[in-house]
């Protein structure tokens, strides 16, 4: 039997395996709400330009309402042999209302139809992600404020070696800044994708007297796309969203990695809540940060989606090719992965138990205050490079002797350089070092509090 959608050209039906391979219903049925919305608007436009009678429009709209009720109730008869969500809805509409259902596809192709559905879907998905990003940013702000008084200090790292002490609040706000940019990228992507492909038809437009501005306006797009080839052939809007999701997941992965490290016995800075950890089937003592590990791993999954779709579109000639069917699975999966990761971190972070004394001791160790001594000599007039060497030699001696910076006496400091005076000794205390980093964007409490107050206003917590 010939295919009901395009069977006129063919003398026999498709191979069974080929038909299953060709079908996309398993994943594009997620677009059913957008397809119904588009169908309603397209039908009203066809009526407005005289291509549907009032009676035909009424029948179509009632049929679409019935279909929506069936899908919501779980009684809609999805049929894989109809390939995709578009043909399933159209076939059911025709069953319900007869010939008017077959008129709905006038002046439209599945090429512009699916491109329109996908843009509509992404608009809604981005709005959901922006709300989740806002919620997580609020969590980060609250956690920063909670750990600012009393001061929670941890070692800052470069090359994963202890470098200089920083406030835990400063650490939280670092991720706040990353997530703020992530939200901006999604907002930018939404702005660019908000143009309507509907009416481009297969690739060349249509001879019917349609009103593309009508459908664009009714669907909430800012305008119709200006080139019919571009409208059906381009997936850069999907790639841009995937790029934003990829960067966002990279940031969540970095946070997860740090928390995994900090929760080990070797660091011992933090304990992960029981609700977000698992045990071992053989080792009774284990508490594994599985959720954080999965967020870290799933960042690779989203990166794979971005790379995969890039590979799909890189060599496609204009206009539509079936290759573009491969845009939805990675995109929908990446959206769900990022959404769930945001929700999980927003729930996990407030339950973290930070070990203030352990962090403080670690921040004091590792010669993290050596830079304070080099800065001191530079402030006294010694060229910084020379000051760097002086303190470097001092640290080497302490390492050899197994001593800490805070053990130094004034006499020992002066033995390394005569510019050291009594006022250098407070620099060997963690509190002094933290308060000295008061440059704009620095880790001093007053600098962090200033940024915290700004961040609270940005997320509506003022």
From Swiss-Prot:
<comment type="pathway">
    <text>Amino-acid biosynthesis; L-arginine biosynthesis; L-arginine from L-ornithine and carbamoyl phosphate: step 3/3.</text>
</comment>
<dbReference type="GO" id="GO:0006526">
    <property type="term" value="P:L-arginine biosynthetic process"/>
</dbReference>
<dbReference type="InterPro" id="IPR022761">
    <property type="entry name" value="Fumarate_lyase_N"/>
</dbReference>
<keyword id="KW-0456">Lyase</keyword>
<dbReference type="Pfam" id="PF14698">
    <property type="entry name" value="ASL_C2"/>
</dbReference>
<keyword id="KW-0055">Arginine biosynthesis</keyword>
<dbReference type="GO" id="GO:0004056">
    <property type="term" value="F:argininosuccinate lyase activity"/>
</dbReference>
<dbReference type="Pfam" id="PF00206">
    <property type="entry name" value="Lyase_1"/>
</dbReference>
<dbReference type="InterPro" id="IPR020557">
    <property type="entry name" value="Fumarate_lyase_CS"/>
</dbReference>
<comment type="similarity">
    <text>Belongs to the lyase 1 family. Argininosuccinate lyase subfamily.</text>
</comment>
<dbReference type="InterPro" id="IPR029419">
    <property type="entry name" value="Arg_succ_lyase_C"/>
</dbReference>
<keyword id="KW-0028">Amino-acid biosynthesis</keyword>
<dbReference type="InterPro" id="IPR009049">
    <property type="entry name" value="Argininosuccinate_lyase"/>
</dbReference>
<dbReference type="GO" id="GO:0005829">
    <property type="term" value="C:cytosol"/>
</dbReference>
<dbReference type="InterPro" id="IPR008948">
    <property type="entry name" value="L-Aspartase-like"/>
</dbReference>
<keyword id="KW-0963">Cytoplasm</keyword>
<dbReference type="GO" id="GO:0042450">
    <property type="term" value="P:arginine biosynthetic process via ornithine"/>
</dbReference>
<dbReference type="InterPro" id="IPR000362">
    <property type="entry name" value="Fumarate_lyase_fam"/>
</dbReference>
<dbReference type="InterPro" id="IPR024083">
    <property type="entry name" value="Fumarase/histidase_N"/>
</dbReference>
<protein>
    <recommendedName>
        <fullName>Argininosuccinate lyase</fullName>
        <ecNumber>4.3.2.1</ecNumber>
    </recommendedName>
</protein>
């Amino acid at each position: 039997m010939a295919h009901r959608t395009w069977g006129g050209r063919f003398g026999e039906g498709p191979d069974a395996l080929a038909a299953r391979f060709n079908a996309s219903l398993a994943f594009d049925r997620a677009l059913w709400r957008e397809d119904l919305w588009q169908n309603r608007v397209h039908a009203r436009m066809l009526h407005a330009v005289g291509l549907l009678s009032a009676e035909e429009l009424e029948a179509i709209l009632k049929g679409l309402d019935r279909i929506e009720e069936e899908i919501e109730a779980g009684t809609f008869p999805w049929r894989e042999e109809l390939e995709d969500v578009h043909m399933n809805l159209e076939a059911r509409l025709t069953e319900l209302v007869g010939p008017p259902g077959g008129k709905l596809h006038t002046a439209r192709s599945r090429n512009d139809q699916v491109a329109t559905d996908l843009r509509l879907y992404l608009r809604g998905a981005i709005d959901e992600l922006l709300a989740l990003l806002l919620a997580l940013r609020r969590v980060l702000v609250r956690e920063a404020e909670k750990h600012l008084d009393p001061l929670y200090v941890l070692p800052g790292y470069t090359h994963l070696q202890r470098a200089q002490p920083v406030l835990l609040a400063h650490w939280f706000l670092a991720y706040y800044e990353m997530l703020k940019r992530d939200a901006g990228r999604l907002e930018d992507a939404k702005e660019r994708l908000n143009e309507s492909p509907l009416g481009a038809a297969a690739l060349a437009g249509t001879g019917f007297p349609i009103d593309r501005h009508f459908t664009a306006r009714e669907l909430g797009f800012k305008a119709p796309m200006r080139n019919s080839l571009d409208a059906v052939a381009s997936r850069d809007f999907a790639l841009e969203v995937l790029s934003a999701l990829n960067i966002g997941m990279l940031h969540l992965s970095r946070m997860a990695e740090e928390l995994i490290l900090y929760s080990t016995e070797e660091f011992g800075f933090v304990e992960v809540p029981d609700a977000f950890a698992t045990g071992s089937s053989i080792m009774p003592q284990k508490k594994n940060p599985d959720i954080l590990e999965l967020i870290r791993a799933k960042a690779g999954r989203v990166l794979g989606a971005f790379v995969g779709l890039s590979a799909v579109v890189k060599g496609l000639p204009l206009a539509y090719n079936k290759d573009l069917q491969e845009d939805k699975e990675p995109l929908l999966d990446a959206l769900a992965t990022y959404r769930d990761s945001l929700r999980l971190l927003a729930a996990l972070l407030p339950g973290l138990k930070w070990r203030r004394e352990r962090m403080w001791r670690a921040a004091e160790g590792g010669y993290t205050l050596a830079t304070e001594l080099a800065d001191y000599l530079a402030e006294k007039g010694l060229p910084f490079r020379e000051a760097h060497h002086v303190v470097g030699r001092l640290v080497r001696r302490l390492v050899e002797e197994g001593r800490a910076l805070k053990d130094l006496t004034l006499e020992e400091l002066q033995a390394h350089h005569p510019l050291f005076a009594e006022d250098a000794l407070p620099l060997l205390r963690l509190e002094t070092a933290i308060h000295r980093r008061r440059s704009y964007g620095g880790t001093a409490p007053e600098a962090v509090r200033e940024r915290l107050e700004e961040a609270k206003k940005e997320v509506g917590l003022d």
